[in-house]
Amino acid sequence: MTAYFIASYRITDPAGYEPYVPAVIPILQATGCEVLAADYASEAVEGEPGEVTVVLKFASKEAGWAWYNSPEYQAIVHLRTDHTKGTAVLIDQWSPPA
């Protein structure tokens, strides 16, 4: 079942975060995931999300976890987590009951 990684965060240290995007792009490309949306000026409808929102599409939740836990991603994830404040979730695609 298709799964989505959704991250919403505020950048707290722009200089520390700056190398993250160029480093993550080739890792994402190697997984075959699809970047559905990425916005540095997210507009809140409810609550207090960060200004950055990213939505990634994976073939399955297992594929999403494989990317997240891969040695390649784990080597750079700190560039995001150390320099931002926010959330990231991995969710299954929803299909209405028949």
PLM ranges: what are they?
Residues 1-52, 59-69, 74, 92-98:
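Short S/T/G/P-rich N-terminal loop/turn motif that feeds into the first structured element of a domain
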Residues 52-54, 86-87:
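Generic beta-strand structural signal
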Residues 72-90:
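Short arginine-rich
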